Design a protein with these regions (language model features):
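Residue-level hotspots at or immediately adjacent to binding/recognition sites across diverse folds
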Residues: 1-261
Length: 261
């Protein structure tokens, strides 16, 4: 996992300044299984562990730990400041202030949660899961698929772009689903950067939305996780992070010899 804010680039275990040459600053115990995190500020993070803990880190120090006893797949901070942690068995937790509460369970594993500027919360996940939360309960939508929906992106007009495995992509708008004809691939993540929507297509490279389909923006990069700031798009793949500023793609590679650890 990777996120970006100005010159800060973060993997699940370390913070790097002056990318890609900066020294690594330890962010969390390397033995923790960090599923995902969201950066509130360059020195302020929310991390969701696969072990079921959600950890808040400020200036390298843990300020809050909540053990929610769920295998988490991700975490998301909404514009209104609420935090959503989500994962297996349809679990979604919401933090308002410092208090966590469990939302009603969904029918399958949750892989992505995003909130719209209007406060509507959307979730997608395994077995074709797609639903919205109105503050009290979920409304499920039938997209006529059982593929895993990996990511969603809420657009300014209120429509929702979704992508997933087995060439699945399209847009949900005005209570209607429109399937897109996209290149054959598995799709893992979506990000809005400098007015364009980018798509992580794994080993097939980085793609960009053009009309109602995807076109290759950069081949020969592994793009499983995307994070965007006003200045950069960070692309995480197999042992590498690529930074895109709209022109160039400098790359940082991690060549760890696991046998020596």
């Amino acid at each position: 996992m990777v996120t970006t804010d100005g010159e800060y680039f973060v993997s699940s275990l370390m913070l790097l300044e002056n990318f890609p040459d900066g020294d690594e600053l330890e962010l969390a115990d390397e033995h923790r299984l960090v599923a995902d995190f969201d950066m509130i500020a360059p020195d302020h993070f929310i991390l969701a562990e696969g072990t079921g803990k959600v950890i808040e880190v400020r200036n390298g120090r843990v300020t809050q730990t909540a053990d929610l006893k769920t295998i988490f797949t991700g975490v998301h901070r909404a514009i209104d400041g609420r935090i959503y942690a989500f994962g297996f068995n349809g679990s979604v937790y919401q933090r308002d202030g410092i208090t966590w509460r469990a939302l009603p369970k969904l029918r399958s594993n949750v892989l992505c949660v995003r909130a719209s500027p209007a406060g509507i919360v959307y979730a997608c996940g395994t077995d074709g899961l797609f639903a919205s939360f109105d503050g009290s309960d979920w409304t499920a939508f039938d997209l006529s698929t059982n593929v895993d929906l990996q990511s969603l992106l809420v657009l300014d007009d209120g429509s929702v772009l979704l992508c997933g495995m087995s060439d699945f992509a399209g847009v949900w708008a005005a209570e209607r689903w429109v399937q897109w004809d996209v290149p054959s691939s598995d799709y893992y993540d979506l990000a809005l950067f400098k007015g364009r929507i980018f798509v992580g297509a794994g080993s097939e490279g980085l793609m960009v939305v053009e009309g109602s389909t995807f076109k290759v923006s950069k081949a020969n990069v592994f793009s499983y996780s995307l994070r965007a700031s006003a200045r950069h798009l960070a692309i995480a793949g197999n042992n590498e992070i690529v930074r895109y500023d709209g022109k160039s793609y400098p790359c940082l590679e991690f060549n760890y010899d696991l046998e020596d650890e």
